[in-house]
Amino acid sequence: MRSVCLSLLLILLPASVLAFEVDHWPDGAFGGQPARLNWQGPVPVPVTRPLTLCALYPHLRDAYWLSVNQGMVEEAKRLGVTLRIHEAGGYGALAEQRQQLQQCVSEGSDAILLGAVSYDGLDEAISASPLPVFGLVNDLPAGLVKAKVGVSWYQMGWQMGQWLAKRHPAGSPPVTVALFPGPQASGGNNFVEPGFADGIEGSAIRLVTTARGDNSREIQRTLVQQTLARHPDLDYLVGGAIAAEVAVNELAQRQRDRPKVLSTYFSHGVQRGLRRGKVLAANSDQMRQQGRLALAQAVCLLQSPEAGEQQCPRVMGPPILTLEAPLANPTDSLSDGTFRPVYRVGVDASGN
């Protein structure tokens, strides 16, 4: 009888409060095998106890962070939360992000959601903040933040490496690959590289070069051009979404179908590339859903600081998808085509 009543309750619940499917790391770090969890999330914030959140992004100049942005905006509106968003201007803007951590305090925020520009360059600034800090997308050292939403970027690299390794196992003809992980020592790149290396270990794949650089189209295009010139017989080019997108364009201009292009993360351009057969495979860490989850996690723990892991998971993220075809429904991964950056939710023109 109890199970029947529960089933009826779930049917009657509006879709907006049904569970998120998440990977959950109860030991507090993005390592090892996560547990799959259906998490209902918090209830909307009562008007008598308003919450103001401050989110800091490395930048908003690519599809990845734009998709995170839309997810956060959607969830802030659903939960009735005031949200202010600041972008640092790039992964080199460490000083700017330190200043923005202080700005969140001066704006009267209740908590900070930090998309960090550095894994370990913000330790002192985070520890000095009087506000609870939540990790957003980019990992931070264990114990430094109250909780975090993201995925294992080691796993992102490993899954792409494994996809290739299964295609070219040991004993098959050798193939070459170039890796374009993005900026040196920033975001998830510290973890993608070793993950990819471990993923291809023991296979017929030989990594001939790793080309690191800022995630701007100009820099990634230059790196791709240099690599194609130095390795004209390259079999695979594996990189972040921007590297994959510019590689597709470069190959089209040169009327070449090699190297084959794979993307370690997702974007609108990568979705188009999969649809047209120009991108062979890609990961999606469902970044729009990460934005929703980050907002929901912060609200959950601000409402219930002593809650257990089942009620408010401290380290979680959406499952990583490895795709060989375009997503039929990309609304958990990509922002809408008409969406533009939003910096304020529930804040009037005067900033209040």
Predicted regions and their residues:
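Structural motif
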Residues: 36-40, 83-107, 209-230, 244-246
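Hydrophobic alpha-helical
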Residues: 111-130, 196, 213-273
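N-terminal signal peptide c-region/cleavage motif recognized by signal peptidases
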Residues: 14-16
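Flexible loop/hinge segments that line or gate small-molecule binding clefts
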Residues: 119-155, 166, 267-280
